[in-house]
């Protein structure tokens, strides 16, 4: 019996919409990352992008447990000397609520060209509206 290997052209990708309102950040991010990789499908192949498209709405209403809202710090560096910037979860959720979910999911995807292709299938919106109704996304309960 031969091992099944999915062909990139033969992969069927569905569109799903996830409501992040009241959900815990890490728990929703792990399920989204798994769906983006395609691990929920029988034809999952590690070196082929078999995942689905995921639309996340209400990103501004995602929650974290404990004191992480004030204690969780996001760092970035400008590559110049002294260019280390930091921002707390509270401030980031006020300024760019989409970025909180994007960073959490991106950290759970593989590094490299395949991981970047998976990440491009993630669409995050701060409010309840999204502009992907033409794709007829199915509601995904997480």
From Swiss-Prot:
Transmembrane segments: none annotated. It comes from Aliivibrio fischeri (strain ATCC 700601 / ES114). CDD domains: Ribosomal_L13. GO terms for cellular component: cytosolic large ribosomal subunit. Part of the 50S ribosomal subunit. The lineage of its organism: Bacteria, Pseudomonadati, Pseudomonadota, Gammaproteobacteria, Vibrionales. The keyword Manganese does not apply. One of its GO terms (molecular function) is mRNA binding. This protein is one of the early assembly proteins of the 50S ribosomal subunit, although it is not seen to bind rRNA by itself. It is important during the early stages of 50S assembly. InterPro entries: Ribosomal_uL13 (IPR005822), Ribosomal_uL13_bac-type (IPR005823), Ribosomal_uL13_CS (IPR023563), Ribosomal_uL13_sf (IPR036899). Keywords: Ribonucleoprotein, Ribosomal protein. Belongs to the universal ribosomal protein uL13 family. PROSITE patterns: RIBOSOMAL_L13. Gene3D superfamilies: Ribosomal protein L13. This is Large ribosomal subunit protein uL13. One of its GO terms (biological process) is negative regulation of translation.
């Amino acid at each position: 019996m031969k091992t099944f290997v999915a062909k990139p052209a033969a992969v069927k990708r569905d569109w799903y919409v996830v409501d992040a309102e009241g959900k815990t950040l890490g728990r929703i991010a792990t399920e989204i990352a798994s769906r983006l990789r395609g691990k929920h499908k029988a034809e999952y192949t590690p070196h082929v992008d078999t995942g689905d498209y995921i639309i996340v709405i209400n990103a501004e209403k995602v929650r974290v447990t404990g004191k992480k809202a004030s204690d969780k710090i996001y760092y970035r560096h400008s590559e110049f000397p002294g260019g280390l910037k930091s921002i707390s979860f509270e401030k980031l959720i006020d300024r760019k609520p989409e970025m909180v979910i994007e960073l959490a999911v991106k950290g759970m995807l593989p590094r490299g060209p395949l991981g970047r292709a998976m990440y491009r299938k993630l669409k995050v919106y701060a409010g309840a509206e999204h502009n992907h109704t033409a794709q007829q996304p199915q509601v995904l309960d997480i």
